[in-house]
Amino acid sequence: MNWSNTPSFLEKQRQRLKRYQFQIKVSEQGRVVSVGDGIIWIKGLPGAAIDEILISEDECCIAMVFHLTEELVGAVMLVQTKKLKAGTPIFPLKRVLSIPVGDKLLGRVIDPLGHPLDGGEIPPHEEQGLLDRLSPHILHRDFVNRPLYTGNKMLDNLIPIGKGQRELLIGDNGLGKSALALDIVMNQKDKKVYCVYVLIGQKRSTVSSTIQLLKKANALDYTTVVVAQATALPGLLYLAPFAGCAIAEHWMKKGLDTLVVYDDLSAHANSYRELSLLLRRPPGREAFPADIFYLHSRLLERSTCLSPAMGGGSMTALPIIETKEGEMATYIPTNLISITDGQIFFDESLFSSGFLPAIDITKSVSRVGAKAQHPQIKKESGRMKLDYLQFLDLELFTRFGAKLDAKMQKQIQKGRVLREILKQERFSPLPIEFQLAWLIAYNEGFFDESNLEDIPQILKKIEKEIKQSNLSLGSPREQWKKAIKEWLMA
């Protein structure tokens, strides 16, 4: 080696010093004033911004700025720790919260910060999605024009849902709202729809049973579960729906179809009320802060159908809300009804009578879903909802002993047959071809002479034959009619 051509050590250092540029780095530091109930009050941090991340010196504490006053900064804790106390230094990171996103989250169970809860590896951080961001611009949106098949006879025909729609599931506790949402998720198998199921404030047993049901139906292959249990910090309960939305939003912007279930937003609203009261914000109606409507609209407006120029992806939202004694006119339910594109109302009296799913047709509506229905389904369902509502009115008269003519008696019998057809067991989504088959059979009068107790067996026979046939939604109606007639006569 020729040492004479090698620069000396001193020469190297001299060149390095010439290239060095002195820069002043200013960092803020605050100090904890008090800690309690998941809230941290901090003195200092004059440059703090809402939603900014804060950490302690040893990074044992992660918090988020939630409230600003002239003297103090109010932050919500996102990690439980006993090391935090008055006087602990706190530093801002000058960035907002984000979560890992992408296909590697499929089949995973995570918390709102992206930490694994299923014992698996930490999700990769190559792709990050902001938890809170602006909804897509109006010019970047498209009309809801493609159906999202739910596998439910009542929804796919009478209350249709389109991709990019926001449909509220509302009703008292224990009436089957979550079961219907799980049915819809299970029905997306092989339909190229990625699902995100967000569990907010649920018991450990409920979380466990939900995950087991998804595993049993092989639905976890295309689903991500975001969990903030009832025992979690209020800050995590608040962030859970935004985390689920960020995960689905990433796929939507890639041109994919996604479905998000928020189970449920009652717990989310309660956690936000708790945080707001602890931070001494002025309470409003039912002690909720004044911006609770903005909170939920900001979340749900991110669900949409993007225009072809933006990739054509969609995010369908199914928020769940709990009522008390069937009262829809309380604060949070009325807010969400006005934000969403329709609601599916679950009635306790229907549940008690054995009509499952206990959906009240008279109070349920889909404002934009009909435009997304397949032409064949739309044509066959036609006036079915109106006819069913008229049947319910007629049936009410029979309870008072009113005499009805033959035409009305026939209408009542046909309505009772339809009611029996619409019954469906939990966790048993049905293919859309079967939906078309029973619609044609009903409209052609193939059920008119059947006893009500025979209806389930007839439907099972049709379902079995559908799986073995080559018929599709695009097949001619006469071909469907001929095939159904042969199945029922065999």
Swiss-Prot record:
GO cellular component: plasma membrane; proton-transporting ATP synthase complex
Keywords: ATP synthesis, ATP-binding, Cell inner membrane, Cell membrane, CF(1), Hydrogen ion transport, Ion transport, Membrane, Nucleotide-binding, Translocase, Transport
GO molecular function, one term: ADP binding
Main location group: membrane
Site (Required for activity): S364
Binding site for ATP: G171, D172, N173, G174, L175, G176, K177, S178
A Pfam family this chain is assigned to: ATP-synt_ab
Reaction catalysed by this enzyme: ATP + H2O + 4 H(+)(in) = ADP + phosphate + 5 H(+)(out)
Keyword Lipid biosynthesis: no
UniProt xrefs under InterPro entries: ATP_synth_asu-like_sf, ATP_synth_asu_C, ATP_synth_asu_C_sf, ATP_synth_F1_a_nt-bd_dom, ATP_synth_F1_asu, ATPase_a/bsu_AS, ATPase_F1/V1/A1_a/bsu_N_sf, ATPase_F1/V1/A1_a/bsu_nucl-bd
Top-rank taxon: Bacteria
Subcellular location: Cell inner membrane
EC number: 7.1.2.2
Membrane topology: Peripheral membrane protein
PANTHER family named in the record: ATP SYNTHASE SUBUNIT ALPHA, MITOCHONDRIAL (PTHR48082:SF2)
Family statement: Belongs to the ATPase alpha/beta chains family.
NCBIfam families xrefs: atpA, PRK13343.1
Role according to the record: Produces ATP from ADP in the presence of a proton gradient across the membrane. The alpha chain is a regulatory subunit.
Subunit structure: F-type ATPases have 2 components, CF(1) - the catalytic core - and CF(0) - the membrane proton channel. CF(1) has five subunits: alpha(3), beta(3), gamma(1), delta(1), epsilon(1). CF(0) has three main subunits: a(1), b(2) and c(9-12). The alpha and beta chains form an alternating ring which encloses part of the gamma chain. CF(1) is attached to CF(0) by a central stalk formed by the gamma and epsilon chains, while a peripheral stalk is formed by the delta and b chains.
Name recorded for this polypeptide: ATP synthase subunit alpha 1
Source organism (scientific name): Legionella pneumophila (strain Corby)
